[in-house]
C-alpha cells in the first residue's frame, strides 16, 4: 500500500516506513504484525490511548443515534460538552470547530471583532511569540512565529508582531495603540518544548489588563490534562480571556474549541460558523474524554508519571553526554540533544519498537497517552538507553 502514496497522496508528510493498522492502549501494530510503544500518541491527541473502551462505546452509541446535524438546530451533546468545558475552566462560552488551526483562526477573528466593536477598528494587531506554532491556515500560519512555515505563502495576513518568549521588556515595547491581543502557548510544542516562565505569563496578563488587550492562550497541545493540570494556564495562577483547545479533547476524534469569557464572546449569528463543528459524534467523544480525565486522581497520576519520566531521562542525561536538557510539564516532555538533527535517534527507536518524534531538529518530543504506566515508561527509557548507547556521536 505504501507504494501507492506518491500516486494518490500529496507529498506533505515525511512519513516513517511503517503502515499502522491497529491500536490498543499505549501500543500500535503495523501491517507486518510488529508492535510499538507509542510515545507520539497522534502528536498529543490520543489522550486515553488507542481504542479506549469508554471512548469506543461513546462513539459507537452516538453513531447509532445521530452522527451529524446542522448548527441550525440544537443538539444535546454539543450543549453538554460546552457545559463541561465551561464549568471545568473559567466559566466561558464555547464555540466548536474541527481542529486546533480552526480554533485559533476563530480566536483571532474573535479578538479582532471584540476590538472592532470597542475601538472602531483602530486596534487589530496581535502579538505572538517567536518560535510559536498555531496552525497552517492563513491566520494561524501568520500567527506562527517561525519563518520556515511562512516561506512560499506570502503575502501573509497583516497585523502580527513576534517577540522572543520570556522577554518581558520586548513584550512591553511591542504594545502600541493598534494592538488588540497577545497570543501565547504556555509550552511551545512544535517549537521545541520551551516553557513560558511564570513571571512571563503573569506579565502577559498584567500587560493585557493595563492596556485592555485580550490574552489568547493556545492550549491545543497543553490542554485536557497533558501537563498534569486540566489546562496549562492552571500552573500559572492566571486566567486567559480566550482559550483554544483541540488534540486531546477528542481522544483521536477531530474536534476543536474556542472558550471565551462571557463578556469577550461577542460573536453574533453570521460572524463565525462551522459546518461540522460541534457535531454530535465529535462532542460525544469529547464528553467521554473529559469524563475520564476529570476522574479523581487522574490528573495527579499524569503529574506523577511525568515527574517519573523526567527523572528517568535525567538519569540517562548523566550517562549519555549527548543529552543536553530535559524540559516540560506532565506528559509533555522534551529532550534536547547536542546534535544538529535528532532523526537518527527517532529512527533507531522505531526499529526497537518505540515511537517518538523530533521537533526543532534536535529536540526529542515525548507525548505518550495519559494512561501510560510507569512500567511502560521504564520500557521506553530502556529503549532510549539502548539507542543512545549504540549510536556513535
Swiss-Prot record:
Pathway: Amino-acid biosynthesis; L-arginine biosynthesis; N(2)-acetyl-L-ornithine from L-glutamate: step 4/4
Single GO BP term: L-arginine biosynthetic process
GO CC annotation terms, alphabetical: cytoplasm
InterPro entries tied to this protein: AcOrn/SuccOrn_fam, Aminotrans_3, Aminotrans_3_PPA_site, Class-III_PLP-dep_AT, PyrdxlP-dep_Trfase, PyrdxlP-dep_Trfase_major, PyrdxlP-dep_Trfase_small
Requisite cofactors: pyridoxal 5'-phosphate
Pfam short name (any one): Aminotran_3
Localization per Swiss-Prot or TrEMBL: Cytoplasm
Quaternary data: Homodimer.
Disulfide bonds: none
An MF annotation (GO) of this entry: identical protein binding
Gene3D superfamilies named in the record: Aspartate Aminotransferase, domain 1 (3.90.1150.10), Type I PLP-dependent aspartate aminotransferase-like (Major domain) (3.40.640.10)
Residues that hold N(2)-acetyl-L-ornithine according to the record: 136, 274
Keyword terms: Amino-acid biosynthesis, Aminotransferase, Arginine biosynthesis, Cytoplasm, Pyridoxal phosphate, Transferase
Family: Belongs to the class-III pyridoxal-phosphate-dependent aminotransferase family. ArgD subfamily.
Reactions listed under catalytic activity: N(2)-acetyl-L-ornithine + 2-oxoglutarate = N-acetyl-L-glutamate 5-semialdehyde + L-glutamate
Entry-linked SUPFAM superfamilies: PLP-dependent transferases
Matching CDD domains: OAT_like
Name the record gives this protein: Acetylornithine aminotransferase
Binding site for pyridoxal 5'-phosphate: 100-101, 133, 218-221, 275
Residue positions where N6-(pyridoxal phosphate)lysine is found in the record: 247
EC number in record: 2.6.1.11
Cofactor note: Binds 1 pyridoxal phosphate per subunit.
Amino acid at each position: 500500500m505504501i507504494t501507492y502514496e506518491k500516486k494518490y497522496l500529496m507529498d506533505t508528510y515525511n512519513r516513517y516506513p511503517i503502515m499502522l493498522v491497529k491500536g490498543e492502549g499505549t501500543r500500535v501494530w503495523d501491517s507486518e504484525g510488529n508492535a510499538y510503544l507509542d510515545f507520539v500518541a497522534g502528536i498529543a491527541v490520543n489522550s486515553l490511548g488507542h481504542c479506549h473502551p469508554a471512548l469506543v462505546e461513546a462513539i459507537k452509541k452516538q453513531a447509532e443515534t445521530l452522527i451529524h446535524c446542522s448548527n441550525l438546530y440544537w443538539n444535546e451533546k454539543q450543549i453538554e460538552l460546552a457545559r463541561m468545558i465551561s464549568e471545568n475552566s473559567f466559566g466561558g462560552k464555547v464555540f466548536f470547530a474541527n481542529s486546533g488551526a480552526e480554533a485559533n483562526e476563530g480566536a483571532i477573528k474573535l479578538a479582532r471583532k471584540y476590538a472592532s466593536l470597542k475601538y472602531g477598528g483602530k486596534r487589530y494587531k496581535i502579538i505572538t511569540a517567536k518560535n510559536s506554532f498555531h496552525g497552517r491556515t492563513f491566520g494561524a500560519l501568520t500567527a506562527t512565529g517561525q519563518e520556515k512555515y511562512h516561506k512560499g505563502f506570502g503575502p501573509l495576513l497583516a497585523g502580527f508582531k513576534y517577540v522572543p518568549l520570556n522577554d518581558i521588556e520586548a513584550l512591553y515595547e511591542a504594545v502600541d495603540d493598534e494592538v488588540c491581543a497577545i497570543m501565547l502557548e504556555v509550552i511551545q510544542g512544535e517549537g521545541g518544548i520551551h516553557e513560558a516562565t511564570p513571571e512571563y505569563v503573569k506579565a502577559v496578563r498584567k500587560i493585557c489588563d493595563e492596556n485592555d488587550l485580550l490574552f489568547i492562550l493556545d492550549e491545543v497541545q497543553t490542554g485536557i490534562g497533558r501537563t498534569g493540570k486540566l489546562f496549562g494556564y492552571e500552573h500559572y495562577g492566571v486566567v486567559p480571556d480566550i482559550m483554544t483547545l483541540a488534540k486531546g479533547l477528542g481522544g483521536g476524534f477531530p474536534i476543536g474549541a474556542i472558550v471565551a469569557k462571557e463578556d469577550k464572546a461577542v460573536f453574533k449569528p453570521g460572524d463565525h460558523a462551522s459546518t461540522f463543528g460541534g457535531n454530535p459524534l465529535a462532542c460525544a467523544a469529547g464528553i467521554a474524554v473529559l469524563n475520564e480525565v476529570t476522574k479523581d486522581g487522574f490528573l495527579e497520576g499524569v503529574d506523577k508519571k511525568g515527574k517519573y519520566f523526567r527523572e528517568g531521562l535525567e538519569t540517562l542525561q548523566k550517562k549519555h553526554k549527548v543529552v543536553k536538557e530535559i524540559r516540560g510539564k506532565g506528559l509533555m516532555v522534551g529532550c534536547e540533544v547536542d546534535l544538529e538533527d535528532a532523526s537518527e535517534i527517532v529512527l533507531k527507536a522505531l526499529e526497537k519498537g518505540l515511537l517518538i518524534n523530533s521537533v526543532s531538529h534536535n529536540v526529542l518530543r515525548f507525548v505518550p497517552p495519559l494512561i501510560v504506566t510507569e512500567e511502560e515508561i521504564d520500557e521506553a527509557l530502556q529503549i532510549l538507553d539502548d539507542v543512545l548507547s549504540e549510536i556513535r556521536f
